[in-house]
């Protein structure tokens, strides 16, 4: 049989029990601080119970907001946010009009304590330009989140040497850093552009389709390499621009 030992507990109006501030409550062998089990649930629908370091409170914990950057700008921290998780890729490399495709951008991910930070500069890498059969496609440019993490763009087709697919970029500074996928070489008809962390490239071309691949080049995942064309008279698709995704945590 359990026993409840009380000392100077007083009841008011038959419903409210007041415990003196000097009295400690123990539950399951653990002391409950501030004589409080839970704050009032009134007005706290869909919120969780947690601690702000001083008191037990109701609040929205975990990831409670997201900011997405598809162009360069400034990240401004939302109220009450202490940590963020950032994922970003650079710009994908451009492709050739005849078989060779671009490399995908690198990827980086990092969890950052932002309790002492209010804003961070964000740079989004641009996709590389396409080329005709014999030229060199442009490389994608780098994305970055302040000085915390960055990711280089993918190489364009024919950058290393003629008829070579583009090499993937690489992330840096993150808790996770990855290469982007490489592009296809000459002779790989309908070869895909390099895949980024976020997905693949647009549809590939065909001589009877003319500029088909280039016309649909924006239907690609961020940071992916340009898909190859399949006819030397047409300009290859560009690489896809980068992206930065910021999850905010309280």
How would you describe each model-predicted region?
Residues 2-62:
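Extracellular repetitive beta-rich solenoid segments
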Residues 9, 184-190:
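Feature marking protein-protein/ligand interface regions
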Residues 26-30, 47, 121-127, 221-224:
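Short sequence segments immediately N-terminal to proteolytic processing junctions that release a mature
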Residues 37-43, 64-71, 165-170:
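Disulfide-bonded cysteine-rich modules in secreted/extracellular proteins
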Residues 43-47, 82-83, 241-242:
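Short, surface-exposed beta-edge/turn micro-motifs
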Residues 68, 74-78, 85-147, 226-245:
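Glycine-rich strand-loop-strand elements at beta-sheet edges
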Residues 122, 198, 202-204:
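Glycine-rich, flexible loop motifs
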Residues 128-176:
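Acidic, low-complexity glycine/serine/threonine-rich segments
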């Amino acid at each position: 049989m359990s026993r409840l030992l009380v000392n100077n507990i007083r009841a008011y109006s038959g419903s409210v029990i007041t415990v003196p501030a000097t009295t400690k409550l123990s539950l399951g062998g653990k002391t409950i601080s501030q004589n409080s089990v839970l704050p009032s649930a009134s007005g706290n629908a869909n919120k969780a119970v947690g601690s702000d370091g001083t008191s037990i409170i109701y609040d929205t914990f975990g990831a409670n907001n997201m900011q997405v950057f598809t162009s360069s700008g400034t990240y401004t921290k939302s109220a009450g946010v202490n940590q963020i998780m950032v994922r970003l890729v650079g710009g994908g490399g451009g492709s050739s009009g005849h078989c060779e495709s671009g490399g995908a951008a690198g990827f980086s991910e990092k969890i950052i304590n932002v309790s002492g930070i209010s804003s961070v500069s964000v740079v989004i890498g641009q996709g590389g330009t396409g080329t005709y059969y014999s030229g060199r496609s442009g490389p994608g440019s780098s994305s970055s989140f302040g000085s915390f993490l960055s990711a280089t763009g993918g190489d364009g087709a024919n950058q290393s040497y003629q008829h070579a697919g583009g090499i993937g970029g690489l992330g840096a500074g993150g808790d996770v850093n990855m290469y982007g996928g490489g592009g296809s070489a000459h002779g790989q008809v309908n070869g895909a552009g390099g895949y980024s962390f976020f997905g693949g490239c647009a549809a590939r071309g065909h001589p009877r389709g003319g500029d088909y691949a280039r016309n649909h080049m924006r239907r690609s995942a961020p940071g992916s390499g340009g898909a190859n064309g399949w006819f030397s008279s047409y300009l290859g698709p560009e690489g896809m621009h980068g992206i930065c995704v910021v999850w905010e945590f309280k």
